[in-house]
Amino acid sequence: MRFDVLTLFPELIQSHLDFSIMKRAKDDGVISVNTINPRDFTLDKHKKVDDTPYGGGAGMVLMPQPYVDAYNNVEKLENSITLMMTPQGEPFNDKISNELAKYEQVIILCGHYEGYDERIREIIKPREISIGDFVLTGGELPALCVIDSVSRKIDGTLGKIESAHDDSFSDGLLEYPQYTKPREYLGYKVPEVLLNGNHKLIEEFRMQQKIERTKNKRPDLYEKWINKK
């Protein structure tokens, strides 16, 4: 899987890849993440990428030329999709993550300041994605959420692909509770069913826990799950 990220702050993207699972996935060649800085495509000596909005208003707006030229400079693979990180986009979820994992290439546009000149949307025509109903200072953190989530779906990123299959939301439910050593800590014990080696009972227990946890913590997800049964 190849990710190409248009960002004014490449270091924010690359630094995330220097640790833990993402570093291993990168080093093993499971994923590659390239950063393209629109500032490198400006036409003036000051490398200006933003300007005041027509019609007035607060903040600075990202100019179309640097972003469109930077995007056009990205080599597009045949099986590719382009995303724009924006609070106006469709809410990102596990279903979308699974969809994106089927592509060879995901190109991501990260905004900053007051936002994009509307012509960037009109020319590039990206799929717009949001990670929630709140505003951040830039699109880099949302882009990293997408990269991290999608990478987990790709065989070779995790030690076992089953780890991703057991994640919360993979079947519409939250993940079951997990335990490790010691068996008892400060009076809190590991459920006995997890210690008896009966895999059928363990599977039933975990499914029951997933249902109860989803019902209590995310009744909206529980309702969707019930209606799909």
Task: Please name every model-derived segment.
Residues 20-24, 98-102, 123-124:
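Short, solvent-exposed amphipathic alpha-helical segments in soluble enzyme
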Residues 61-112, 117-118:
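S-adenosyl-L-methionine/SAH cofactor-binding core of RNA-modifying enzymes
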Residues 1-74, 195-222:
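N-terminal nucleotide/polyanion-binding subdomain common to many enzyme families
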Residues 141, 153-192:
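Internal, active-site/partner-interface "lid" segment
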Residues 116, 120-167:
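Structured adenosyl-cofactor binding patch, chiefly the S-adenosyl-L-methionine
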Residues 87-88, 168, 216-229:
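Charge-dense polyanion-binding interfaces
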Residues 4-6, 34-36, 81-83, 106-107, ...:
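Hydrophobic/aromatic beta-strand patches that form the interior of the parallel beta-sheet core
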Residues 49, 54, 92, 100, ...:
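Short clusters of hydrophobic/aromatic residues that line enzyme substrate/ligand-binding pockets
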